[in-house]
UniProtKB/Swiss-Prot annotation:
Induction: Expression is increased during ergosterol starvation, during anaerobic growth or in the presence of SR31747A, a sterol isomerase inhibitor. Exogenously-supplied zymosterol is entirely transformed into ergosterol, which represses ERG2 expression. However, exogenously-supplied ergosterol does not affect ERG2 expression. This is C-8 sterol isomerase ERG2. It is found in: Endoplasmic reticulum membrane. It comes from Saccharomyces cerevisiae (strain ATCC 204508 / S288c). The keyword Membrane applies. It holds the Pfam family ERG2_Sigma1R.
Length: 222
């Protein structure tokens, strides 16, 4: 019984956060999944019509198109040194943060060698638009996989979980909208349970906190 007050507090806080998730929190969103999909498809089409362009060129052009639409103050510069590994849910990939705030994050995520794992269960909606390669995903009861190819957006709803895989050379633009701080432990716990890659953890925390602080204090973006 001594834990009852704590459990009650957690329940009340969770209830309030869930109410705010559908009422107040969306008023802070600046990104629209449909618009992001249109921007991505526009860049993908241009690259499909061109020759000699690399995957990195594609990623940089997506970033530039986003900055042109939303403004450089909200979209970080593409700096190769700011790519970091991401170990979460048994999967390992690479990511660079384009925008991070309390209510949203926008990243380029992918893998040069291929990966497979658990999506995690999040207090946020996740929109995963494939830029190059493929993502395969499935719910627990599925007997056939969902297949997402360039230009398609995979929407993982709040509270749901899937198994997913991406072959080598697959990259995507990922938008999460919700209580972003609640997602962070999922991205950090593998450091202590398996990888012990403290440098990557430090870089991830630093880059995330830097951008959240900038958007909260400078851009007044929650």
């Amino acid at each position: 019984m001594k834990f009852f007050p704590l459990l009650l507090l957690i329940g009340v806080v969770g209830y309030i956060m869930n109410v705010l998730f559908t009422t107040w929190l969306p008023t802070n969103y600046m990104f629209d999944p449909k618009t992001l999909n249109e921007i991505c498809n526009s860049v993908i089409s241009k690259h499909n019509a061109a020759e000699g362009l690399s995957t990195e060129d594609l990623l940089q052009d997506v970033r530039d198109a986003l900055a042109s639409h939303y403004g450089d103050e909200y979209i970080n510069r593409y700096v190769k040194e700011e790519w970091v590994f991401n170990n979460a849910g048994g999967a390992m990939g690479q990511m660079i943060i384009l925008h991070a705030s309390v209510s949203e994050y926008l990243i380029l995520f992918g893998t040069a060698v291929g990966t497979e794992g658990h999506t995690g269960v999040h207090f946020a909606d996740d929109y995963f638009t494939i830029l190059h390669g493929t993502q395969i995903a499935a719910l627990p009861y599925a007997t056939e996989a969902e297949v997402y190819t360039p230009g398609m957006t995979h929407h993982l709803k709040k509270g749901y979980a899937k198994q997913y895989s991406m072959p080598g050379g697959s990259f995507a633009l990922e938008l999460a909208q919700g209580w972003i701080p609640c997602m962070l432990p999922f991205g950090f716990l593998d450091t202590f349970s398996s990888t012990l890659d403290l440098y990557t953890l430090y870089r991830t925390v630093y880059l995330t906190a830097r951008d959240m602080g900038k958007n909260l204090l400078q851009n007044k973006k929650f």
